[in-house]
């Protein structure tokens, strides 16, 4: 009888532990970026697939809402054949509607190097103290807008001279963070790039 009593108590303790575990583990916590909105700007053609999709995945995994903008709305094809739907045009996109703005690279991003609308969005984002990010060749958009002067920044190697001529300290690193400006050097760095944007938004 005594053994049966001890066995019954042990079962109750085990069951009690199982029912309490989810609460102790914080399973009901909201993602860290719940309520945050991020704008991803892609070229009108030939954006770099990983730089959009991997970065976007990291942001959404953390709970952020994302939107894609380009020169025109509609379906756009990347360099590797992936497609993305731009729901906003550059002319209608406003930095004030988002917590961060990300310029995606790829060969097509060069069309924004001296684009006044792209530069206006970049300048507004920085002026409003929000997170501003660019990857691959896209950091040249920020450099040409005068936003990298005196800043540590990286980019695809072809852009190193332009960044330096615009006053940036070119690091050559995969990802570089300087305050709220985040830059990365190419598709292999896209996941880390996304993670750094997540950190900056927390």
Regions found by a protein language model. Name each.
Residues 15-17:
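C-terminal motif of bacterial Sec signal peptides marking the signal peptidase cleavage site
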Residues 19-128, 141-145, 162-172, 176-202:
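Extended, subdomain-level signal for the structured scaffold at the beginning of enzyme domains
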Residues 1-4:
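Positively charged n-region of N-terminal signal peptides that target proteins for export
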Residues 148-157, 170-173:
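Short hydrophobic/aromatic-enriched beta-strand-loop microsegments
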Residues 135-138:
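Short, thiol/selenol-centered motifs that function as redox-active sites or metal-ligating centers
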Residues 6-13:
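Sec-dependent N-terminal signal peptides
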């Amino acid at each position: 009888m005594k053994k049966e009593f001890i066995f019954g108590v042990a079962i109750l303790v085990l069951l009690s532990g199982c029912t309490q575990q989810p609460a102790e583990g914080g399973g009901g916590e909201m993602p860290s970026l719940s309520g945050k909105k991020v704008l991803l700007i892609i070229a009108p053609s030939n954006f770099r697939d990983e730089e959009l999709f991997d970065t976007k995945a990291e942001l959404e995994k953390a709970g952020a809402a994302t939107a894609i903008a380009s020169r025109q709305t509609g379906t756009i094809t990347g360099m590797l054949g992936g497609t993305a739907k731009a729901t906003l045009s550059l002319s209608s996109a406003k930095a004030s509607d988002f917590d961060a703005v990300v310029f995606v690279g790829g060969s097509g991003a060069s069309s924004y190097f001296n684009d006044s609308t792209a530069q206006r969005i970049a300048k507004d984002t920085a002026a409003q103290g929000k997170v501003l990010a660019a990857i691959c060749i896209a950091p040249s958009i920020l450099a040409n807008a005068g936003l990298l002067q005196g800043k540590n920044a990286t980019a695809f190697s072809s852009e190193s001279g332009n960044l330096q001529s615009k006053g940036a300290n070119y690091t050559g690193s995969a990802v570089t963070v300087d305050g709220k400006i985040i830059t990365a050097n190419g598709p292999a760095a896209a996941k880390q790039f996304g993670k750094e944007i997540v950190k900056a938004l927390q």
